[in-house]
Amino acid sequence: MESEMATAKELKELSADDLKQRAAELRETLFQDQLKRRTGSLDNPAERTQHRRDLARVLTVLTQKTKA
């Protein structure tokens, strides 16, 4: 996922299914980042941190939607 991540406000407008799909994509991206880090081919380590934060943001909004 190379594009800029949506803000929490934008994420709140998405459906629960869309959020689950985005969370799955971010988990896959994190897995790829982990493999790249282990092989030494991760160009920008800050991207891994950003992906972790993006996943946390998506999961937070998803939890808020399911409890509401």
Swiss-Prot record:
<protein>
    <recommendedName>
        <fullName>Large ribosomal subunit protein uL29</fullName>
    </recommendedName>
</protein>
<dbReference type="GO" id="GO:0006412">
    <property type="term" value="P:translation"/>
</dbReference>
<comment type="similarity">
    <text>Belongs to the universal ribosomal protein uL29 family.</text>
</comment>
<dbReference type="InterPro" id="IPR036049">
    <property type="entry name" value="Ribosomal_uL29_sf"/>
</dbReference>
<feature type="region of interest" description="Disordered">
    <location>
        <begin position="32"/>
        <end position="68"/>
    </location>
</feature>
<dbReference type="GO" id="GO:0003735">
    <property type="term" value="F:structural constituent of ribosome"/>
</dbReference>
<feature type="compositionally biased region" description="Basic and acidic residues">
    <location>
        <begin position="45"/>
        <end position="56"/>
    </location>
</feature>
<dbReference type="InterPro" id="IPR001854">
    <property type="entry name" value="Ribosomal_uL29"/>
</dbReference>
<dbReference type="GO" id="GO:1990904">
    <property type="term" value="C:ribonucleoprotein complex"/>
</dbReference>
<keyword id="KW-0687">Ribonucleoprotein</keyword>
<dbReference type="Pfam" id="PF00831">
    <property type="entry name" value="Ribosomal_L29"/>
</dbReference>
<dbReference type="GO" id="GO:0005840">
    <property type="term" value="C:ribosome"/>
</dbReference>
<keyword id="KW-0689">Ribosomal protein</keyword>
